[in-house]
Regions:
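Glycine-rich, low-complexity intrinsically disordered segments
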Residues: 1-156
Length: 156
């Protein structure tokens, strides 16, 4: 399971109450009420000569943050995004094991898909969001490793 805590410079905690039954119905998760559930999270950094940071892409269910994300892209709001990844540990419980943090991020693309519930083969209404950012950090919590990259510092 992956979750997102998203805070905007103007709107505050955009992810507030996003994982409640009012927001996402029976998909809600106790203990993660103020986070956005992620269906997928993708990120790419490449290098030919200089390092190239590509937008972070995530897919999420349509929830109560969806209108706020529209406001955010419209106003070019500066965001802080913290993605947390959970896995099942040896005792059968979920444990936080990985964290990805974006600072000075902004939404560059929103693409929404509204499926027909009666014939969608389990696909729920969702949206794909792309975020540009100034810096990114990674932390493998259980293994004790971490790293970061700042876009401006990567021209060689």
């Amino acid at each position: 399971m992956t979750y997102l805590k998203l805070t905007g410079s103007r709107q505050g905690l955009i992810s507030a109450k996003c994982s409640t039954s009012e927001s996402i119905g029976n998909r809600f998760q106790t203990g993660h009420e103020d986070e956005i559930q992620e269906l997928t999270l993708n990120h790419n950094i490449s290098r030919s000569q200089n390092l190239s940071h590509h937008p972070v892409q995530f897919i999420k269910p349509i929830d109560m943050s969806s209108p706020l994300l529209g406001v955010s892209i419209s106003s070019n709001e500066q965001l802080e995004a913290i993605f947390t990844c959970y896995r099942t540990n040896q005792n059968g419980r979920l444990e936080l094991y990985y964290k990805l943090k974006l600072t000075k991020a902004s939404i560059v693309d929103i693409s929404s898909t509204y499926t027909n519930v009666t014939n969608s083969n389990g696909i729920i209404p969702h949206e794909k969001i792309l975020l540009n950012y100034e810096s990114i950090s990674w932390e493998h919590i259980t293994a004790g490793t971490s790293g970061y990259s700042i876009m401006e510092n990567n021209i060689f």
